[in-house]
Amino acid sequence: MAADDYVVADMSLAAWGRKEIEIAETEMPGLMACREEFGEAKPLKGARITGSLHMTIQTAVLIETLKSLGAEVRWASCNIFSTQDHAAAAIAETGTPVFAVKGETLEEYWTYTDRIFQWPDGQPSNMILDDGGDATMYILLGARAEAGEDVLSNPDGEEEEILFQQIKKRMAETPGFFTRQRAAIRGVTEETTTGVNRLYQLQKKGLLPFPAINVNDSVTKSKFDNKYGCKESLVDGIRRATDVMMAGKVAIVCGYGDVGKGSAQSLAGAGARVKVTEADPICALQAAMDGFEVVTLDEAIATADIIITATGNKDVVSLDHMRKMKDMVILGNIGHFDNEIQVAALRNFKWVNIKPQVDLIEFPDGKRIILLSEGRLLNLGNATGHPSFVMSASFTNQVLAQIELWTRGSQYENKVYVLPKHLDEKVARLHLAKLGANLTKLSPEQAAYIGVTPEGPFKPDHYRY
């Protein structure tokens, strides 16, 4: 790695990061099993992976797993606040180009996204590992602009304006870059709900130029990372940010998908009185039967002490909503992007920074709101994200998906796929021993009776866990 082919906050943090990586490895049995199973064969040899995913200690274990399987890797964080600086330093020290600093500006964020596609030999990336879809969209939007489409004229807000400027800069410096890069990609594996939705929209419009694997909807990702991970990391983030006592407080969770379910349980476990808002009648019924009061934000917002968005949608909490909130309400988001809360509408008010990623915003009438991570992912901005064990399941899916597309990509059409059931079950199986769990074995007669083999898969694809 060239001396300038990385950007981290402080290389002196590398030793600390390495110690935490070694601890995390003991909590990530799926990734360690991948190293043992595939390390000698090097199935990712020749893969040049551009990774855009929160640069945490757990991600460091993922990066080193990909490298141990033969891949070359360049990495940036997919959120301006989610990097753990000691993790980034530890990875940079090993020679992996990483561009990630906790508290990046938006200009830096999109510069770093560009740099993970800039290999020293000038050749393009051939795989993308994405979280939220920004790396994928950067290339696809740039290629459309190079083809003459008018896609860079009307930015929707500050971040798009900065993104468009970065694309124009790269087009001027390296004509044809995006088109060549798009043609070289064999496939993308996408980590999260928001990024998956973007891929399905591209597929629907016929604009997806390579196959994609939807890692998010692997059962061992969405039903574990999204639910159990949020169940632990949401309250961790709120506590580190505010030191508030949640017992007895009224909390509203906007959205009751897998992330919302984990978030509501997290707050309830801390003793909060939880209310849920939901647009989907099925999710709303689930929330009601799980014991939560299902309300509209308009009717309940004035009662809330804590408000958390988890919808994956935009403008969920508007300025009008915020005008109705209590004084000193805690407002945060655990969805991927920062547009669930209309943070831009608050910029003309008085902001007082309490500590990193905690701001006190004063309205003209004197009312104050405590905003966490500027409306971005608070569990990563104000804490350290999900625990290692649950991320092992998610990241094992990522490794298997990268192997699948790299080794068998020609067998896939330009569509969005999920990993087959037997691999989903394999990921779960790899994590049972760590928890002391023992599987019951079906007899051949029992397996035949329910129409499966004794080794599985045990459920049809349409089964809802």
UniProtKB/Swiss-Prot annotation:
- How cofactor binds (record note)? Binds 1 NAD(+) per subunit.
User: Which keywords accompany this UniProt record?
Assistant: Cytoplasm, Hydrolase, NAD, One-carbon metabolism
For this record, the Gene Ontology CC terms, alphabetical, are: cytosol
User: Would the keyword NAD be found if you checked this record's keyword annotation?
Assistant: yes
What is its pathway?
Answer: Amino-acid biosynthesis; L-homocysteine biosynthesis; L-homocysteine from S-adenosyl-L-homocysteine: step 1/1
EC top class, in one word?
A: hydrolase
Top-level taxon of the source organism: Bacteria
List the catalytic activities from the record. S-adenosyl-L-homocysteine + H2O = L-homocysteine + adenosine
Where does the record say this protein resides?
Answer: Cytoplasm
- Binding-site residues for substrate, renumbered to this chain: 56, 131, 191, 221, 225
Binding residues for NAD(+): 192-194, 226, 255-260, 278, 313, 334-336, 379
Q: What is its EC number?
A: 3.13.2.1
List the cofactors. NAD(+)
Q: Which family does it belong to?
A: Belongs to the adenosylhomocysteinase family.
Task: Describe its function.
Answer: May play a key role in the regulation of the intracellular concentration of adenosylhomocysteine.
Q: What is this protein called?
A: Adenosylhomocysteinase
Organism expressing this protein natively: Chelativorans sp. (strain BNC1)
> Lineage of this protein's species?
Bacteria, Pseudomonadati, Pseudomonadota, Alphaproteobacteria, Hyphomicrobiales
**Gene from which this protein is expressed:** ahcY
